[in-house]
């Protein structure tokens, strides 16, 4: 059985609307391509107290959680510090992170044709990006070598921290999936089967939904209302989703009951998750 996957997107710029989040859709895509699914997503500003609480909850779970943003070295970057507080450990300069940061410093100096001085004040400050919670491991960054980090939570969780830049975060998340999660790929194929019930009201469909879930406990029933559609008008997409071997029986009961009750049914939709 695969674990639950979660996402924490950090940054005041997301909540204020200065930047639009691109991570949610991409993480859903990366997981879906591997037969996995996102269970939840949290959005948190650069508020140390709220961020610490969010990460404590993630750490206490048994989930795999990706956290994007706030791991830089400016005063508004609070994710590294909040992660350490959430885990009850101190921050410490990770030796591999130090080496990678200095490698990046040397690369930039070489590109500019300048001497490399690791003791210069700004270069010493850059080492703060390698201050990770004690016990953390390196998360490689193929874009510019400045690493993220991964931590184990007391509940058995795995927390993976990346920069907020999509060009860095997405390949880092993909690296975690390929190197840490491959044994869960396509382990439990999921599907959904639904139908558009035209002119229906959710209240009238609720008893049927409850009955299907009682009869098929491994399957979830869903309803998605649309108020006005240019072709189908007001309707409800009613369906079942779950393991591929469990959905057909639940679907047959659902559609038979709809036909028996005289519901006006439109197109059916089948989707592999």
Feature names for model-found ranges:
Residues 25-86, 92, 103-106:
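N-terminal small/polar loop signature for handling phosphorylated ligands or for N-terminal nucleophile
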Residues 6, 63-64, 130, 136-137, ...:
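Structural motif
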Residues 1-41, 46, 248-249:
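Glycine-rich phosphate/diphosphate-binding loop of Rossmann-like nucleotide-binding domains
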């Amino acid at each position: 059985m695969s674990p639950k996957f979660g996402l924490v997107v950090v940054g005041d710029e997301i909540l204020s609307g200065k930047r639009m989040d691109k991570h949610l859709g991409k993480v859903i895509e990366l997981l879906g391509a591997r037969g996995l699914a996102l269970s939840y997503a949290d959005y948190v500003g650069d508020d140390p107290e709220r961020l610490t609480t969010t990460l404590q909850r993630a750490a206490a779970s048994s989930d795999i959680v990706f956290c994007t943003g706030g791991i830089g070295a400016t005063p508004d970057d609070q994710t590294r510090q909040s992660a350490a507080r959430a885990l009850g450990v101190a921050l410490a300069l990770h030796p591999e992170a130090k080496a990678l940061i200095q490698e990046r410093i040397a690369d930039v100096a070489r590109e500019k044709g300048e001497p490399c001085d690791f003791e210069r004040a700004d270069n010493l400050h850059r080492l703060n990006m390698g201050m990770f919670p004690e016990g953390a491991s390196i998360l490689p960054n193929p874009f510019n070598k400045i690493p993220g980090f991964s931590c184990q939570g007391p509940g058995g969780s795995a927390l993976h921290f990346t920069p907020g830049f999509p060009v860095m975060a997405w390949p880092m998340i993909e690296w975690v999936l390929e190197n840490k999660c491959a044994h869960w790929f396509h382990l439990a194929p999921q599907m959904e089967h639904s139908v558009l019930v035209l002119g229906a009201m959710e209240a009238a469909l609720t008893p049927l939904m409850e009955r299907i879930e009682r009869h098929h406990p491994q399957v979830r029933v869903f309803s998605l209302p649309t108020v006005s559609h240019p072709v189908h008008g007001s309707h409800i997409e009613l369906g079942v989703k779950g393991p591929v071997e469990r959905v057909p029986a639940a679907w047959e009961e659902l559609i038979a009951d709809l036909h028996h009750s005289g519901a006006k049914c439109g197109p059916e939709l089948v989707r592999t998750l």
